Amino acid sequence: MLTHEISENEKPREKLQNYGIEALSSSELVALIIETGTKNESVLTIANRIIMKFKNVGEMQYASIEEFQLVNGIGIAKASKIMAAIELGRRISIVTEQEEVVVRCPEDAVKLVMPELAFLFQEHFHCLFLNTKNQVIYRQTIFVGGLNASIVHPREVFRLALRKSAASIMCFHNHPSGDPTPSSEDLLVTKRLAEAGNIVGITLLDHIIIGKNKYISLKEKGYF
Protein backbone atom coordinates (compact mmCIF):
# COMPACT_ATOMS: atom_id res chain seq x y z
CA MET A 1 0.00 0.00 0.00
CA LEU A 2 1.46 3.33 -1.07
CA THR A 3 1.44 6.40 1.14
CA HIS A 4 -1.31 8.18 -0.80
CA GLU A 5 -3.59 5.15 -0.36
CA ILE A 6 -3.47 5.29 3.43
CA SER A 7 -6.36 7.14 5.05
CA GLU A 8 -5.55 10.48 6.63
CA ASN A 9 -6.19 9.14 10.13
CA GLU A 10 -3.70 6.31 9.62
CA LYS A 11 -0.83 8.46 8.45
CA PRO A 12 1.73 8.85 11.26
CA ARG A 13 1.77 12.64 11.10
CA GLU A 14 -2.00 12.96 11.27
CA LYS A 15 -2.17 10.30 13.97
CA LEU A 16 0.33 12.27 16.05
CA GLN A 17 -1.70 15.44 15.64
CA ASN A 18 -4.96 13.74 16.56
CA TYR A 19 -3.87 11.40 19.35
CA GLY A 20 -0.42 12.49 20.52
CA ILE A 21 3.06 11.06 20.03
CA GLU A 22 2.45 8.28 22.59
CA ALA A 23 -0.19 6.74 20.31
CA LEU A 24 2.31 5.99 17.55
CA SER A 25 3.87 2.57 17.12
CA SER A 26 7.63 2.18 16.77
CA SER A 27 7.21 1.70 13.03
CA GLU A 28 5.21 4.91 12.79
CA LEU A 29 7.88 6.82 14.70
CA VAL A 30 10.52 5.53 12.28
CA ALA A 31 8.26 6.50 9.38
CA LEU A 32 8.14 10.07 10.68
CA ILE A 33 11.93 10.13 10.85
CA ILE A 34 12.62 8.80 7.35
CA GLU A 35 9.64 10.79 5.93
CA THR A 36 9.27 9.18 2.50
CA GLY A 37 8.91 5.79 0.89
CA THR A 38 10.03 4.70 -2.55
CA LYS A 39 8.30 4.44 -5.91
CA ASN A 40 7.03 0.98 -5.05
CA GLU A 41 6.79 0.95 -1.25
CA SER A 42 5.20 3.17 1.36
CA VAL A 43 7.19 4.77 4.11
CA LEU A 44 5.41 2.53 6.64
CA THR A 45 6.43 -0.60 4.77
CA ILE A 46 10.06 0.44 4.91
CA ALA A 47 9.76 1.48 8.55
CA ASN A 48 8.29 -1.92 9.42
CA ARG A 49 11.22 -3.59 7.67
CA ILE A 50 13.66 -1.61 9.81
CA ILE A 51 11.89 -2.60 13.03
CA MET A 52 11.81 -6.27 11.98
CA LYS A 53 15.55 -6.29 11.27
CA PHE A 54 16.36 -5.82 14.96
CA LYS A 55 15.32 -8.00 17.91
CA ASN A 56 13.80 -4.98 19.62
CA VAL A 57 13.81 -1.21 19.31
CA GLY A 58 16.60 -0.94 21.87
CA GLU A 59 18.97 -2.84 19.59
CA MET A 60 18.78 -0.04 17.04
CA GLN A 61 21.01 2.16 19.19
CA TYR A 62 23.94 -0.19 18.60
CA ALA A 63 23.58 -0.37 14.81
CA SER A 64 25.99 1.35 12.47
CA ILE A 65 24.93 3.53 9.57
CA GLU A 66 26.02 0.72 7.24
CA GLU A 67 23.67 -1.73 8.96
CA PHE A 68 20.71 0.57 8.40
CA GLN A 69 21.67 0.90 4.74
CA LEU A 70 21.40 -2.88 4.37
CA VAL A 71 17.64 -2.48 4.73
CA ASN A 72 15.95 -2.30 1.34
CA GLY A 73 14.71 1.25 0.76
CA ILE A 74 17.21 2.89 3.12
CA GLY A 75 20.01 4.97 1.64
CA ILE A 76 22.57 7.24 3.23
CA ALA A 77 20.08 10.10 3.75
CA LYS A 78 17.47 8.02 5.58
CA ALA A 79 20.12 6.12 7.54
CA SER A 80 21.65 9.43 8.64
CA LYS A 81 18.27 10.68 9.88
CA ILE A 82 17.76 7.52 11.95
CA MET A 83 21.27 7.76 13.41
CA ALA A 84 20.71 11.42 14.28
CA ALA A 85 17.42 10.66 16.04
CA ILE A 86 19.01 7.83 18.04
CA GLU A 87 21.96 10.00 19.05
CA LEU A 88 19.69 12.84 20.12
CA GLY A 89 17.66 10.44 22.25
CA ARG A 90 20.85 9.04 23.77
CA ARG A 91 22.09 12.51 24.68
CA ILE A 92 18.78 13.45 26.23
CA SER A 93 18.76 10.24 28.28
CA ILE A 94 22.11 11.01 29.92
CA VAL A 95 21.37 14.63 30.78
CA THR A 96 21.16 14.99 34.56
CA GLU A 97 21.21 17.72 37.15
CA GLN A 98 24.91 17.07 37.54
CA GLU A 99 25.42 19.21 40.63
CA GLU A 100 23.05 16.87 42.51
CA VAL A 101 24.80 13.65 41.48
CA VAL A 102 27.03 12.36 44.28
CA VAL A 103 29.62 9.69 43.53
CA ARG A 104 30.16 7.47 46.57
CA CYS A 105 31.72 4.48 44.83
CA PRO A 106 32.83 3.34 41.36
CA GLU A 107 29.40 1.87 40.67
CA ASP A 108 27.75 5.28 41.11
CA ALA A 109 30.03 6.74 38.46
CA VAL A 110 29.65 3.79 36.12
CA LYS A 111 25.87 4.25 36.13
CA LEU A 112 26.45 7.73 34.72
CA VAL A 113 28.84 6.80 31.93
CA MET A 114 28.00 3.20 31.00
CA PRO A 115 25.07 4.12 28.70
CA GLU A 116 27.29 6.55 26.83
CA LEU A 117 30.49 4.51 26.52
CA ALA A 118 29.66 0.81 26.57
CA PHE A 119 28.81 0.29 22.91
CA LEU A 120 30.95 2.82 21.06
CA PHE A 121 33.06 1.58 18.16
CA GLN A 122 36.06 3.77 19.06
CA GLU A 123 37.81 4.32 22.36
CA HIS A 124 36.61 7.45 24.16
CA PHE A 125 38.40 8.95 27.15
CA HIS A 126 35.82 10.59 29.41
CA CYS A 127 36.15 12.49 32.69
CA LEU A 128 33.88 13.40 35.57
CA PHE A 129 34.89 16.50 37.52
CA LEU A 130 33.83 16.59 41.18
CA ASN A 131 33.75 19.13 43.99
CA THR A 132 34.81 18.59 47.61
CA LYS A 133 31.48 16.85 48.34
CA ASN A 134 32.05 14.36 45.50
CA GLN A 135 29.24 15.95 43.51
CA VAL A 136 29.62 15.89 39.75
CA ILE A 137 30.05 19.45 38.53
CA TYR A 138 31.04 18.72 34.94
CA ARG A 139 31.71 15.87 32.54
CA GLN A 140 33.34 15.73 29.15
CA THR A 141 34.89 13.40 26.60
CA ILE A 142 38.50 14.55 26.31
CA PHE A 143 39.95 12.26 23.65
CA VAL A 144 38.66 9.92 20.97
CA GLY A 145 40.80 7.16 19.50
CA GLY A 146 43.28 4.59 20.74
CA LEU A 147 44.32 5.23 24.32
CA ASN A 148 48.06 5.68 24.60
CA ALA A 149 50.48 7.87 26.47
CA SER A 150 51.23 9.99 23.41
CA ILE A 151 47.57 10.97 22.96
CA VAL A 152 46.24 11.32 26.51
CA HIS A 153 48.02 14.35 27.92
CA PRO A 154 47.49 15.01 31.64
CA ARG A 155 47.76 18.74 30.97
CA GLU A 156 44.57 18.67 28.87
CA VAL A 157 42.69 16.82 31.60
CA PHE A 158 43.87 18.97 34.47
CA ARG A 159 43.62 22.24 32.57
CA LEU A 160 39.90 21.58 32.32
CA ALA A 161 39.76 20.42 35.95
CA LEU A 162 41.36 23.68 37.08
CA ARG A 163 39.02 25.71 34.90
CA LYS A 164 36.03 23.99 36.52
CA SER A 165 37.52 24.34 40.04
CA ALA A 166 37.33 20.58 40.52
CA ALA A 167 38.66 19.00 43.70
CA SER A 168 39.00 15.58 42.10
CA ILE A 169 38.40 13.71 38.87
CA MET A 170 37.35 10.27 37.73
CA CYS A 171 38.50 9.04 34.34
CA PHE A 172 36.89 6.44 32.11
CA HIS A 173 37.52 4.89 28.76
CA ASN A 174 35.79 2.13 26.88
CA HIS A 175 37.18 -0.98 25.22
CA PRO A 176 35.19 -1.54 22.01
CA SER A 177 36.05 -5.25 22.23
CA GLY A 178 33.83 -5.44 25.30
CA ASP A 179 36.67 -6.78 27.47
CA PRO A 180 37.64 -4.24 30.18
CA THR A 181 40.97 -5.89 31.05
CA PRO A 182 43.56 -3.07 31.28
CA SER A 183 46.47 -2.92 28.85
CA SER A 184 49.98 -1.78 29.69
CA GLU A 185 49.17 1.55 28.01
CA ASP A 186 46.08 1.92 30.21
CA LEU A 187 48.22 1.48 33.32
CA LEU A 188 50.87 3.91 32.07
CA VAL A 189 48.28 6.59 31.32
CA THR A 190 46.75 6.07 34.76
CA LYS A 191 50.11 6.43 36.48
CA ARG A 192 50.82 9.67 34.63
CA LEU A 193 47.40 11.09 35.48
CA ALA A 194 47.77 10.22 39.16
CA GLU A 195 51.22 11.82 39.32
CA ALA A 196 50.01 14.97 37.57
CA GLY A 197 47.04 15.17 39.93
CA ASN A 198 49.33 15.01 42.94
CA ILE A 199 51.36 17.90 41.54
CA VAL A 200 48.39 20.22 40.94
CA GLY A 201 46.44 19.12 44.01
CA ILE A 202 43.53 17.49 42.19
CA THR A 203 43.04 13.85 43.14
CA LEU A 204 42.53 11.13 40.55
CA LEU A 205 39.86 9.12 42.36
CA ASP A 206 39.73 6.32 39.82
CA HIS A 207 40.30 5.27 36.24
CA ILE A 208 37.56 2.89 35.17
CA ILE A 209 37.58 0.80 32.01
CA ILE A 210 34.16 0.16 30.50
CA GLY A 211 33.39 -3.05 28.66
CA LYS A 212 30.11 -4.49 27.46
CA ASN A 213 27.91 -4.52 30.57
CA LYS A 214 30.97 -4.78 32.84
CA TYR A 215 33.81 -2.63 34.08
CA ILE A 216 37.11 -2.68 35.95
CA SER A 217 38.11 -0.06 38.53
CA LEU A 218 41.88 0.35 38.42
CA LYS A 219 41.73 1.89 41.90
CA GLU A 220 39.91 -1.10 43.36
CA LYS A 221 42.37 -3.45 41.65
CA GLY A 222 45.27 -1.62 43.26
CA TYR A 223 46.93 -0.42 40.07
CA PHE A 224 47.56 3.03 41.56
Curated annotation (Swiss-Prot):
Biological processes annotated in GO: proteolysis
Binding-site residues, Zn(2+): H173, H175, D186
Pfam families (UniProt xref): RadC, UPF0758_N
Molecular function per GO: metal ion binding; metallopeptidase activity
InterPro entries per record: MPN (IPR037518), RadC_JAB (IPR025657), RuvA_2-like (IPR010994), UPF0758 (IPR001405), UPF0758_CS (IPR020891), UPF0758_N (IPR046778)
Keyword vocabulary terms for this entry: Hydrolase, Metal-binding, Metalloprotease, Protease, Zinc
Occurrences of domain MPN (ranges): 102-224
Residue ranges annotated as motif JAMM motif: 173-186
Xref: NCBIfam families: PRK00024.1 (NF000642), radc (TIGR00608)
Family under the similarity heading: Belongs to the UPF0758 family.
Protein name per UniProt: UPF0758 protein lmo1549
Organism for this UniProt entry: Listeria monocytogenes serovar 1/2a (strain ATCC BAA-679 / EGD-e)
